Design a protein with these regions (language model features):
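Conserved PLP-dependent catalytic core of the aminotransferase class-I/II
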Residues: 143-144, 150, 308-309, 313-365
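Long amphipathic N-terminal alpha/beta scaffold segment
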Residues: 36-75, 104
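Conserved PLP-enzyme active-site core in the AAT-like
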Residues: 94-316
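Glycine-rich phosphate-binding segment of PLP-dependent enzymes
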Residues: 26-27, 31, 61-62, 71-93
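Long amphipathic alpha-helical segments
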Residues: 1-48
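Short Gly/Ser/Thr- and Asp/Glu-enriched loop/turn motifs at secondary-structure junctions
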Residues: 4, 59-63, 122, 274-278, ...
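N-terminal glycine-rich anion-binding loops that anchor highly charged ligand groups
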Residues: 15-31, 57, 190-192, 318-319, ...
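Conserved C-terminal alpha-helix-loop-beta "cap" of PLP-dependent enzymes
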Residues: 341-419
Length: 431
C-alpha cells in the first residue's frame, strides 16, 4: 500500500485549525502505524472533533435566555481591539485611575458609594470575605441554613467561605429562619458578619419564613456587624419601566438598588445574568469597604480586562439612558407574544420540512428565577434521527442549537435576536 505523509494529510483535507495543530494531529496518527485508509478516516475525525471545540458564535434556539453553556447574557460588542485609555487620563496626559468613568456611572445607576469589578460573582464573594477577615479581624459568617446554596459547576457556598479563611455558622432551619436566630449567633460570636444569599436558582414554598435586609440591618447596627448581600442575578432595572411594560414576573426579585437602600453594606452580583452584560462580578456599597477590597493584594489577581470593563461601561450607559430594550436580555424577555408569532410564522413559510407551530415556554436560565416561564410560540420538527439532525445543525460555520423534546427538534426564537432568523431558515432547510 502506498505510504501517506503528514503533508499529504494536511494539504488534502482543509481545516480551519492552525496548520501546526493539523500537522501535530497527522504526526500522532501516522506514528500509530495504522493503514492508509484508517489514517485518513482518523485524521478527518480528529480534525472535525477539534474544530467543534473552537469557541464560536452559535444561534441559541433553546428558549433558555441566559443559557449557562452558551455564555449566559448575549451582548452587542462594541470594542474590537486596539489600545484603550483604561488607566490614562486624557485631560492630564498621564496615568489615571483605572475605569474611573465606569465606577462613577455605576455608582449613579446603583446609588452606591463605591463599586469595584472582578472576574465573576464567586470571586466577588471570596475577595469580599477574605478582605474583611484580614482587615477587621472577622472570624465567622452567619447565614441562614436555607440560603446555603449550590449553583452550576459545583460552586458550593460553604467551600467559598471556608477558602476565605472564615468559619460558616448556620442559623435557623431550611424552611424557617427568624431574626432571633441571627441575634443569638451574634451574641455568641460578635466577631462575625451577616451574609444574606438570594436563592436565585431554587425556591422554597409553603411553611416558610426568612429575614429581610431591613430587619438584618437593624440587628447589624445594634451589634456593629457588617451586613453583606450576595444577590447573584443582579436585577438593576427600574421598577417603573417594568410596570410600564406590564411585566410582573420580577415583583419578588430584589434589585441591587433596593438591597443597598434597605441597608446592605455591600452587595455582590453577576454581570452576565439579569444585568445583561459580560461575565464579571460587581461589588457595590460602602466607600470604605470597597476601598479596602481594591487595596487588597488579591484584588489585582481578580480584576477585569479592558474588554470586560468596556462592555460593562456600554451596558451601564444603556441603563442610564433609559435604553433598556437595546440590552439583549431585556429585548428577549420583554418581546411580546405577537412579535414572536410573526417571526415564527415567517420562518414557517420559508422552510420545507414537516413542522408544526405550537405554544411553548421559554426559561430565563442562568440559575435565575427557575419557577418563572414565558409563553412563547415555537416550531416543532418531528425527527426520525435526532442525532443526525443535530449533527447537521451543529456542523455549520454558525451552528444552530435547538431544544430537544421527545422526538422533536424545538426552535424557540425568544432566545435569539431577529437578525438570526434568515440563518435559521437556511439551516433548517438543510435537514
Amino acid at each position: 500500500m502506498e505510504n501517506i505523509s503528514v503533508n499529504n494529510l494536511v494539504e488534502e483535507f482543509e481545516s480551519s485549525l492552525p496548520r501546526e495543530i493539523s500537522i501535530s494531529i497527522a504526526k500522532n496518527i501516522l506514528n500509530s502505524k495504522i493503514s492508509k485508509e484508517n489514517a485518513i478516516s482518523e485524521y478527518k475525525k480528529n480534525i472535525g472533533l477539534l474544530e467543534k471545540k473552537i469557541q464560536r458564535q452559535v444561534i441559541n434556539c433553546t428558549g433558555t435566555l441566559l443559557h449557562t453553556n452558551l455564555g449566559r447574557a448575549q451582548i452587542n460588542p462594541r470594542f474590537t481591539g486596539g489600545a484603550s485609555n483604561i488607566e490614562y487620563d486624557l485631560d492630564q496626559h498621564k496615568r489615571g485611575e483605572r475605569n474611573e468613568y465606569l465606577t462613577s456611572s455605576m455608582n449613579l445607576l446603583l446609588n452606591s458609594e463605591n463599586v469595584c469589578f472582578v472576574n465573576n460573582n464567586a470571586a466577588a464573594l471570596f475577595i469580599t470575605l477574605s478582605t474583611v477577615k484580614n482587615s477587621s479581624n472577622i472570624k465567622n459568617v452567619i447565614i441562614s441554613r436555607g440560603e446555603i446554596i449550590e449553583i452550576g459547576g459545583s460552586y458550593r457556598l460553604p467551600e467559598i467561605i471556608e477558602s476565605s479563611g472564615l468559619k460558616l455558622q448556620e442559623v435557623g432551619t431550611t424552611n424557617k429562619t427568624d431574626i432571633k436566630d441571627y441575634e443569638k449567633a451574634l451574641k455568641s460570636n460578635p466577631d462575625s458578619i451577616l451574609l444574606k444569599v438570594h436563592r436565585s436558582n431554587f425556591s422554597i414554598k409553603g411553611f416558610t419564613k426568612e429575614v429581610s435586609i431591613k430587619e438584618l440591618k437593624t440587628l447589624s447596627t445594634k451589634y456593629k456587624a457588617h451586613l453583606f448581600h450576595d444577590l447573584g442575578s443582579g436585577l438593576v432595572i427600574d421598577r417603573n419601566f417594568l410596570e410600564a411594560k406590564e411585566i410582573d414576573i420580577f415583583n419578588s426579585e430584589p434589585t441591587v438598588q433596593e438591597s443597598l437602600e434597605d441597608g446592605s453594606d455591600l452587595v455582590m452580583f453577576s454581570g452576565d445574568k439579569l444585568f445583561g452584560s459580560v461575565q464579571s462580578g460587581i461589588i457595590a456599597g460602602k466607600e470604605n469597604l470597597v476601598k479596602e477590597i481594591k487595596n487588597d493584594p488579591l484584588f489585582r489577581t481578580y480584576r477585569c480586562s479592558p474588554l470586560i470593563l468596556f462592555e460593562l461601561q456600554n451596558t451601564v450607559n444603556k441603563y442610564i439612558d433609559k435604553n433598556e430594550m437595546s440590552i439583549p436580555i431585556w429585548s428577549s424577555l420583554l418581546m411580546k407574544y405577537e412579535e414572536l408569532l410573526a417571526r415564527v410564522d415567517d420562518i414557517s413559510k420559508k422552510i420545507s420540512i414537516d413542522h408544526k407551530i405550537f405554544d411553548s415556554e421559554s426559561l430565563i436560565g442562568g440559575g435565575t428565577m427557575p419557577d418563572k416561564k414565558l409563553l412563547t410560540p415555537a416550531i416543532g420538527i418531528p425527527s426520525k434521527n435526532i442525532d443526525e439532525d443535530l449533527r447537521i445543525l451543529s456542523n455549520q460555520e454558525i451552528p444552530l442549537i435547538p431544544r430537544i423534546s421527545e422526538d422533536k427538534i424545538i426552535i424557540d426564537v425568544r432566545s435569539c435576536p431577529v437578525e438570526d432568523d434568515e440563518k435559521i431558515i437556511e439551516l433548517l432547510n438543510k435537514l
